[in-house]
Amino acid sequence: MITYTRTANAGGILEMDGVRILLDGVSQAVNDYLATPPDLLNTLYDTHLDMIAFTHNHSDHFQPEFVRSYVKHHPLPKLIGPKDVAADLSDYAVITASSSVGAVQLIAVPSRHMGAEYTDTPHYSFLIRGSSLDWFMGDASPPQWKGQDHFPHPDVLIAPYAYASTEAAWEITEQITQGKILLTHLPDKERDSAQLWPAVEKVLDQHDRFRVRIPRMGDVCEVY
């Protein structure tokens, strides 16, 4: 069984083949986007992690203070992220490329961040290959994958709301995978000033919603 537990705005713990990977798993509140709640943060401090991976250096995805506190009480996990993540964790050996633990391989895919203002932001998405193939997008922009047939089609796609907020984006999402989809990076419905929830629900109502899940904070999803 492979599980994903949401612990942050756009990330969480992926547990596959006995390996635990924290993916963008601790966040600070930014605008309507959610911070990691204190109870989940305490749980993370008590959890053995084999890898900690960050897609990019934005505070709703990356909290270097968590790493510094975590390693005071645990052996140093493998740390993976782009160059500006490595710069903010310069006391540790951050891997700025692909890596593996046991039978699980994490493949760093250079990706373009959503939004024209973030064109120069170093950003990875992560392919996680073990007994299933999962793709964790972080904040990777959907249009960059259009027509990119050389990428494998994952069994599970973990992606931000933008992959289902318009019909054009959903068409790309369906080209990426016919497997399960976990949508992240959505605020609480009660604090959704950008009206992201209505946009996503409008698209999903027109398509095969049964394979899409939008986990709440702390939800454990059996993904494979």
Tell me the role of every PLM-derived stretch.
Residues 5, 90-102, 120, 148, ...:
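Binuclear metal-ion centers of metallo-dependent hydrolases, dominated by the metallo-beta-lactamase
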Residues 40-99:
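Active-site HxH/HxHxD metal-binding segment of metal-dependent hydrolases
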